[in-house]
A protein has these predicted regions:
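Active-site rim/adjacent substrate-binding subdomains
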Residues: 19-172, 177-206
Length: 206
């Protein structure tokens, strides 16, 4: 997802505090990193189904570090490995919340490897979503307001958490990428075509 913060348009479920997920310290992913090119629609690679990670090794952690660097540079708040051309089930998310007192951005990098949604609510939340692979385009997307998800972190530790709010929306958005789905695929054909036309117009003007 992009750094354009999702705008909450409608919320049915009661808001819960975003959990502080147990991941490796930020410095684990903020050293010796490289910025990777982000694939943009309509690149056919974005339609690939990503494969599970068999072992969380140094190669996976190096990719995670590069993904964080790429996401922060874009800037964005979420990135899937397939968006940098790697069809593996790896996601990175950092909501980069603001410090209420100093107003500074607080980084909170989170890693999701082989994520699965185990339960989801019938209640929906609608957020104005964007995507680094569909630059400068946004649309209101309805998703389950509360989910229970399972995943591995960057150290291979399993987590099972009940999530809601922005983190739940962002995780579902990024997990769509693992199935070859973009946020615009949730729209009607008319709305999707309008976004594609705007995207092509911006590219021609660049």
């Amino acid at each position: 997802m992009t750094a354009h913060w999702p705008r909450r348009c409608a919320r049915v479920a009661q808001c819960l505090d975003d959990p502080r997920l147990d991941v490796a310290p930020p410095n684990t992913y903020l050293a010796a990193m490289a910025i990777l090119p982000i694939i943009e629609a309509p690149d056919p690679r974005l339609k690939l189904i990503s494969k599970p990670v068999e072992a969380v090794d140094d190669g996976v952690r190096a990719l995670i570090a590069d993904m964080f660097e790429t996401m922060y540079d874009a800037p964005g708040i979420g990135l899937a490995a397939i968006q940098v051309g790697v069809p593996k089930r790896i996601l990175v998310i950092d909501l980069q919340e603001k410090d209420e007192e100093g107003g500074e951005t607080i980084r909170d990098p989170r890693v999701f490897i082989n994520p699965e949604i185990m339960e989801e609510s019938e209640e929906l939340s609608v957020y104005n979503e964007g995507c680094l692979s569909v630059p400068e385009q946004y649309a209101d997307i309805a998703r389950p307001a509360v989910i229970t998800a399972k995943w591995l972190d960057g150290e291979g530790k399993e987590h099972v958490e009940r999530l809601d709010g922005t983190i739940a929306t962002c995780l579902q958005h990024e997990m769509d990428h693992l199935q070859g789905i973009l946020f615009i695929d949730h729209l009607s054909r008319l709305k999707r075509d309008m976004i594609v036309k705007r995207l092509n117009k911006l590219r021609r003007a660049a």
